Amino acid sequence: MHYSALHRYTSYMNNTPTLYLPAHVTRYVTMKSGDRLALTKTIRANHRFIASRATWGGRTVFCKQPQAGMTGADELTREVEGLVAFNQFARDVAIPFCVPRLLYHDDSLLVTTFVDGYQTSMYTVPPEFWVRSFVAMDRYFRQPVRRLPRWARPSRRGRYIWEDMEYGVRKTAEWAIYPGLLADCLAYLRRYATALEARPMHADFTDGNTMFDNKNYWVIDFESFRPDWPRWYDVVNFTYNRMITRPEVTDQMQLILSQTVKQLGESPTTAHEIRFSAIMRGLSFLIEGTTPGGKGHASTNWISEERRYRVVQSLRFLVSGGDLTKM
């Protein structure tokens, strides 16, 4: 391990950021429309957003505000676009979940209907819910003309995704992965980027963003929504992440992934598309686990040696052509 990389990692570990958990928030927020929103309870707060229960026009609503300097109009814009797209989805198709209704938004505030429920757990939600949801989303958001996702195109900075990933790993996580394995991962991303297909996608469709009100499931938090995520990303993000963080549910995750693929049908590029997203998630684990949460990502969990080992082993398996449903 290089001393400089170890020193950076040790410094981060010794200076873990404290989440911003205010004892109270501003009692009233003035909307650009001139209305006033009364904030009655902070539901959750981190370094990116403050989410509150509020009262507006005599009814209880949900309010989301970005933290100054961390998030801004682009994240709220994506959330608005996601809420609009998924509300239309819910109206057009019989799906196993509901979506909050967008009531108001500007560049510093988002208001939706309030979901009076509790966050679900993967241990309480049946696998069939996830399979039905992933299949329904894929079919509904399928595009009439195949197009490449943003990961297959240069960014606004003129870099491809594998160049960004190499930069991120070498900056803070170079010590966490063998140089040859990193090179193999980057080569895979370069080779198969054009095999990807774009889809509008929630991109964080997980138990952490699913609530239950004793009658219906509700999907929330659309800040990661984009119209050009790679197909399969949502199901890989859900299943692969849990294979790494909760290995005891690996069999269940592999069942969800395999059933989703079976119902949608495989194409000649399906295996590469799934592998591509899993490799991206593996490298992201290393980057997110060695940098403090901020504008680049929301994670605040530092990677343990056990988790790092699982990530590295999974990347070895994937670049050698392994099937994620059998990992």
Per-range role (PLM):
Residues 17-36, 145-202, 321-326:
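An alpha-helical support segment within catalytic cores of ATP-dependent transferases
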Residues 30-58:
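ATP-binding glycine-rich phosphate-binding loop
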Residues 47-78:
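ATP-binding glycine-rich loop module of kinase domains
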Residues 89, 118-155, 179, 183-184, ...:
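Conserved kinase catalytic-core helix
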Residues 96-109:
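Short beta-strand micro-motifs within the conserved protein kinase catalytic domain, predominantly
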Residues 107-119:
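Conserved short submotifs of the Hanks-type protein kinase catalytic core
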Residues 208-236:
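Catalytic activation segment of kinase domains across protein kinase-like and atypical kinase folds
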Residues 233-266, 279-301, 306-309:
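Active-site activation/catalytic loop segments of kinase-like enzymes and analogous catalytic loops
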